[in-house]
Design a protein with these regions (language model features):
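Extended hydrophobic/aromatic-rich secondary-structure runs
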Residues: 118-129, 148-150, 156-157, 162, ...
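Proteins enriched for Cys/Gly/acidic motifs involved in redox and nucleic-acid/cofactor modification
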Residues: 20-21, 48-49, 132-161
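Helix-turn-helix
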Residues: 28
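Enzymes that bind and transform nitrogen-containing heteroaromatic metabolites
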Residues: 1-25, 40-41, 67, 85, ...
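Zn2+-dependent cytidine deaminase-like catalytic core
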Residues: 31-137, 256, 275-277
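Short low-complexity, flexible loop/linker segments enriched in glycine and/or proline
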Residues: 116-118, 142-146, 212-214
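Hydrophobic, well-ordered secondary-structure segments
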Residues: 117, 135-142, 183-190
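Generic secondary-structure signature for well-ordered alpha-helical cores
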Residues: 12-19, 62-65, 122-125, 143, ...
Length: 343
């Protein structure tokens, strides 16, 4: 039970790397002394910089170094055993003579899976593993990383807002469906993805800014890291600076794979969203449920011929309803990653 508490802490630390560590996985580590005191902790912040284990061990005060041979390190992902931009973390744990290492989940990739465990045990470090429920959470945390490497495409999230009577918009005007509070949820989703895509019609009709101002208004660096794509045949003069256009989904996904972008948020409109759904190119979907029907400014129902229906998810996929920022969202998860990779 005590092990679980520290692994929970490692998981929480790992999640802090969501906006910055891609294309690397999120990893957290906690060093615990023989008396149960946390001696040091850390997480992987960004590629090329210290891994979680390095940061956690570097956080241990000099006066606590003598405690390391009786201490345990908790790591959410198997410590690496290969030389890349940084030395192997497993070798560092051995070098610092830690007594024990508790691992959240084994590296999911066959060519490196288990090698960190082997290096640790050969170096005299006791190795234990988190229970199944925590193992699943450690894997799920890195679903974007796993999706890109196993499926050869980014993790794809669909997101839209729909009126109570099932419409996403109108052909001649914008519908106000989200509240200022629920927009924060959408911007948080944007911040957790490396790229956004909308259709040509959405670009022309809505002139969206596609930034994260409602979630992290001062995060200029994060806005610059966000790739913005338009799906459709778009003239150069129509594209805002820094945005890119692709005529086909396959071209977009191939470009993202080349660029090492692990996650894509698809925001609309209906035609674009439905294209991803029909090709089974989605891993997660969020649909905000508006509280009003599609009405004009005077409260009258709009003619049906002016309305654009919301996308239709396959009936075989069930959804959960969750409350975020005071609004109900329907949430779907594709079984693909769970069935094939244990997520």
């Amino acid at each position: 039970m005590t092990d679980n508490i520290y692994m929970e802490r490692a998981l929480l630390l790992a999640s802090h790397g969501l906006l910055s560590c891609a294309p690397n996985p999120m990893v957290g580590a906690v060093v615990v002394g023989p008396d149960g005191r946390i001696l040091g902790e850390g997480y992987h912040i960004r590629t090329g910089e210290g891994h979680a284990e390095v940061n956690a061990l570097n956080a241990v005060k000099k006066e606590d170094w003598p405690l390391l041979p009786e201490s345990t390190i908790y790591v959410s992902l198997e410590p690496c055993a290969h030389y890349g931009k940084t030395p192997p973390c497993a070798a560092l744990i051995v070098k610092r003579r830690l007594k024990r290492c508790v691992i959240g989940c084994i590296d999911p990739f066959s060519r490196v899976s288990g090698k960190g465990v082997e290096m640790l045990r050969q170096g005299g470090v006791e190795v234990d593993f988190a229970p199944e429920e925590l193992r699943q959470r450690c894997l799920h945390l890195n679903k974007r990383f796993i999706c890109q490497h196993h499926l050869g495409r980014p993790f794809i999230t669909l997101k839209w807002a729909q009126t109570r009577d099932g419409y996403i918009g109108a052909t001649d005007r914008r519908l106000t469906i989200s509240t200022s509070e629920s927009r924060m949820f959408g911007h948080r989703l944007r911040a957790s993805h490396q790229a956004i895509v909308v259709g040509h019609n959405t670009l022309l009709q809505d002139a969206p800014r596609l930034d994260i101002r409602h979630w992290a208004s001062g995060s200029h660096r994060r806005d610059e890291m966000l790739g913005v794509y338009i799906l459709g045949r778009v003239g150069e003069e129509e594209l805002p600076h820094g945005w890119q256009a692709f005529a086909h989904i396959d071209d977009l996904l191939e470009n993202m794979q080349r660029e090492g972008q692990q996650s894509l948020l698809v925001e609309g409109g209906t035609q674009v969203l439905q294209s991803f759904i029909e090709r089974d190119l989605w891993d997660e979907a969020w649909a905000e449920q508006g509280t009003n029907d599609a009405l004009d400014t005077e409260g009258h129902c709009l003619p049906e011929e002016l309305l654009v229906a919301a996308p239709k998810m396959p009936r075989e996929f069930s959804y959960d309803e969750e409350i975020h920022f005071g609004r109900t969202f329907r949430h779907w998860e594709s079984p693909l990653l769970k069935e094939n990779y244990g997520l």
